[in-house]
Design a protein with these regions (language model features):
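Bacterial Sec-dependent N-terminal signal peptides
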Residues: 1-24, 168
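N-terminal "domain-start" segment that seeds a small globular fold
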Residues: 21-48, 166-167
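Short loop/turn microsegments at loop-to-beta-strand junctions
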Residues: 33-34, 56, 135-136
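Short active-site neighborhood of thiol/selenol oxidoreductases, capturing the structured segment around
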Residues: 48-65
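Conserved redox-active cysteine motifs that mediate thiol-disulfide chemistry
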Residues: 60-77
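Conserved segment of the thioredoxin-like fold in thiol-based oxidoreductases
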Residues: 80-122, 128-135
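Thiol/disulfide oxidoreductase modules built on the thioredoxin-like
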Residues: 110, 118-164
Length: 168
């Protein structure tokens, strides 16, 4: 009986993990990106509207997320390559502890703007607004405030940036 319980439990957990990584909950390309205002590491308010007229790459992540931390060097490389273009990089952390968030930003050398609600992931407003079921998740918002790209793990992101900015 216990064996059947564990088999059922593991099957359900696997299905949830696979479903959790599905892009279907993300905002569709062309959709107006929801407005938000969050607090930066420096304690300043940052709104999506602050970046009007520029592309905005939004990286949803957390210090405790292994896949997010593993992707940090790739994001650093993209920032080095495209950071001087008409694009702002914005990290949105799902950390609920400021110290963990700040330490990860410093350790991973994430030198762009970072914001957080400092709440557990599922308790944040922005995770619902942007359909975040798995992290890392990356959005690219166009200069008109519409979704130009959305993907879990950022597959195809560099190709999209190359298409927009014409770099190889």
């Amino acid at each position: 009986m216990k064996v059947m319980f564990w088999i059922s439990f593991l099957a359900a957990l696997t299905l949830e993990m696979v479903h959790g990584q599905d892009n279907s909950a993300l905002l569709k390309v062309g959709t107006q990106a929801p407005a938000f205002t969050l607090t930066s590491i420096e304690g300043k308010t940052v709104s999506l509207s602050d970046f009007k007229g520029r592309y905005v790459l939004i990286d949803f992540w957390a210090s405790w997320c292994h896949d997010c931390r593993k992707a940090s060097p790739e994001m650093v490389a993209l920032f080095a390559k495209y950071g001087k273009e008409n694009i702002a990089f914005l990290g949105v952390s799902f950390d609920d502890k400021r110290e963990n968030w700040e330490n990860a930003v410093k350790h991973d050398q994430l030198t762009w703007t970072h914001v957080s609600e400092l709440k557990k992931w599922k308790e944040t407003t922005i995770s619902g607004q942007y359909g975040i079921r798995w992290i890392p998740t990356v959005y690219l918002i166009d200069p008109d405030g519409r979704v130009a790209y959305a993907d879990i793990n950022g597959r195809g992101l560099e190709e999209k940036l190359q298409e927009i900015f014409g770099r190889r």
